[in-house]
Curated annotation (Swiss-Prot):
Residues 144-160 have a biased composition (Basic residues). Its main location: cytoplasm. Involved in urease metallocenter assembly. Binds nickel. Probably functions as a nickel donor during metallocenter assembly. It comes from the Bacteria. One of its GO terms (molecular function) is unfolded protein binding. Pfam families: UreE_C, UreE_N. The gene is ureE. Keywords: Chaperone, Cytoplasm, Nickel. Signal peptide: none annotated. GO terms for biological process: protein folding; protein-containing complex assembly; urea metabolic process. Residues 1-20, 138-160 are annotated as: Disordered. This is Urease accessory protein UreE. It is found in: Cytoplasm. Belongs to the UreE family.
Length: 160
């Protein structure tokens, strides 16, 4: 099985394949998938790396694959009032909901309970299948948010 072990910063060479993956899979550092023709592949990357649409991975044999964000069930929030959208971000963030924030609204993985909450704030919520590319988060370039493996403690202002 072809195994992809590194992310390429050099996008000069055209990828040999593409791999369409939902966000849940793109968060994992180790997984199996398959190309559209059914060829099985493996991905083994450093922990904590989230694959983004357009990333290119390379195998030890030099084969390259372009990652694509697969369409998946998402809730699409639309509104013209920036304050209402900010309130929705606040309430969804308090629930640790992963969000895609665009110029004209928000997207999150579909959840009817969250949809009802957001509608209660006065926003319009629709359902669609679309690529989901959420915000990387405040700690994207730093250390992992978990506490396993290090000996000191620090407060975050919220419970885990």
């Amino acid at each position: 099985m072809l195994t992809f072990t590194k992310r390429c910063d050099d996008h000069g060479k055209t990828p040999d394949h593409s791999l369409s993956l939902p966000f849940e899979t793109r968060q994992k550092s180790r997984f199996r998938a398959q190309f559209e023709d059914g060829t099985p592949v493996g991905v083994v990357l450093d922990r904590g790396l989230i694959l983004r649409h357009g990333d290119v991975l390379e195998s030890d044999e030099g084969v390259r694959v372009r990652i694509e964000a697969a369409p998946e069930p998402v809730s699409q929030v639309r509104g013209t009032d920036p304050l209402l959208l900010a309130r929705a971000c606040y309430h969804l963030g308090n629930r640790h909901v992963v969000l895609q924030i665009d110029a004209d609204g928000l997207r999150y993985l579909h959840d009817h309970v969250l949809d009802d909450m957001v509608r209660g704030l006065g926003l319009t919520v629709g359902f669609t299948h679309a690529p989901f590319e959420p915000e990387a988060g405040a700690y994207a370039g730093g250390h992992a948010h978990g506490h396993g493996g290090h000996g000191h403690h620090h407060a975050h202002g919220h419970e885990h």
